[in-house]
Amino acid sequence: MANTIHFRFRISVLLLVLLTAPTLTPAGQTAPAPATKHSAIESHFAAAQQAQRDKDYGTAEREYQAVLVLAPDFAEVHMNLGLVYQLQDRFSEAMTEFRRALKIKSGLAGANFFLGVDYCKLGEGMKAIAYLKAALQTESNRPDIWLWLATAQEIAADFQAEVVTLHRALQLQPEDIDLLYLLGHAYERLGKQEVAHLEKLAPGSSRNEQLLAESYASSNEWPSAVIHFQNALVASPNRAGLHAELGEVLLRAGKVNQAIREFDQELRRDPGSLRSLVRRGEARLIQENVDASLPDWEKAIGIDVEQTERLLGLREAGFGDSALEQLPEATREKIQKLGGDLQNRDSSAAHLALAFLAEQNGNFSQAATEASFAASGARKEVPSRSCTEANVNLALERGQFSEIAPCIEKVLTSRTSAELRIRIASASLESGEYETALKALEELPAADQNSAEASYWRARCYEKLATAAFLRLYHADPNSYRLHQLMGDLEAARGDDGKAIEEYRAAIALRPSLPNLHYSLGHLLWKDLKVPEARVELEAELVLNPRHPGALNDLGDTYLLEHQPHLALPYLVRALAADSGNPEIQRDLGTAYSELGDYRKAEEHFKIAVPADHDGSVHYKLARVYQALGEKENAAREFALSTALNRESHSKLEKQTERLGAVTTSAEDP
């Protein structure tokens, strides 16, 4: 949780005068001080501030202390003295002075703010929150205080509160790239919580497999996505939408014939499946079968023209959304030849196809024009319907998701069933109304809040909201260090270390003091066993944040690789202090102590790490420790456990590899 911890501190320091603006009358003093004393206070205070501006912190410290000898209850001076200590990285002394300032004047915004910042740096988010909220009582329009409050909430793992805080800060600075980046990641963490909850609640369930499949699909790992969609279908053969989603994955992988078979399957179950009609029409267009493509799109337009356009990427759907992905270059060139035929066809579907071709060719103005022709040609006089539950149900059954948006607030009440709420949330999500979808889920009855179905849809909402935040970041500044950082994160998640390293280096070139960047780069370099380069970056991260658990752990591991446990140990001890619940650090500490011959300490750490052992490696290390201690029975038990886990792990891997190979080679598509 250290990824925002030193950011903007220097800027905050420069703004200190706005937070304090002290008078030269100590708190609690009701009568003016004698003129001589007052003059001395003014003189020392002015000298201290000048020294502080000149970065002569030793002189500033002496002058502030001289003021406090004359006026020990001068709260602002205690605070400024604390700041001088802070600028010299004397955090303990700084915090003492901030507390003294607050004891005299509890509402002092600057002292509350900086004390909150210091608790963030110590990893004590809950303590920081109280001080930062106090600072906001008097300085509610300061985005940097809101940013630090969000940081404290992140450290405390209160991601819901962090999201609320970041939205409040974005009201003050709507295009702030730091706030938008953090908002996207806060939503990502909430999504991961839901994924973990679903895995625990319903492991191997259809929804759990579907969520895994969608995750692999978004990372362009199509064979793994196919396997998990197939698993989901085995668990729930009749679940709506699964064949359509599987078809989309196959279509993006260029397996057009297989994709069409999946769309056909979905349409046999539901002839009005909008997604299947749109994608089957797209697949047939890719096959240059215009006569088969246009009827599907004509039918889709008749159901919901706005949603049809959204699925084809003609309406902005989100940063990295699959609907916005271009087809392969060869496919784009091939289908562009269909333009002449389509121009001779006067139908809404033909205009939609022309819009799709233009969008794929990067001609967005022409795409918009053709899309408007398609929409106007399809628009009919629809009798106005009242916003009743029956009418909303009818629209949901017909897949007319765009029609329900104006009715949602009227239809959703405390008496609305959980089933209808979830269906409305699903439709809102499909229509790009992510906040509306989440709100519908948040108001589910208590008994349904933790269901697998609710957890699945919340995870989907958080994923889309994260995407929307990152899209806003892209629009705010497409060349910013935050966007390079985001692209590095995405490439790292996809396993493309080379591209990720390029992006992180680009971000560092623009903002070398940004927390977590050096770690992200160093971690990938360490993963690629580029040890000297990795150490440079990891040490740079520790200059910014000496308590960064990831940087400390990786540095320790670089020395374990070189069999230098005496150098690894200090880093690993510090890493554990910063992240005591991490089993990997426990394992690495056990390894260090084992290599140093301190087997009892090694045993202690390995025993904490074994519950997270999935391949038998930790049990094996523990067995070796017992062997060294002469405890034969314990060693035999751990060796047996290690062998069993290792065999099971290898078996799973072989089966997974076999299935991936089968999926990859089974397609007959060119």
Language model features by range: what are they?
Residues S39-L70, L87, N208-N220, A350-Q360, ...:
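Alpha-helical segment of the N-proximal tetratricopeptide repeat
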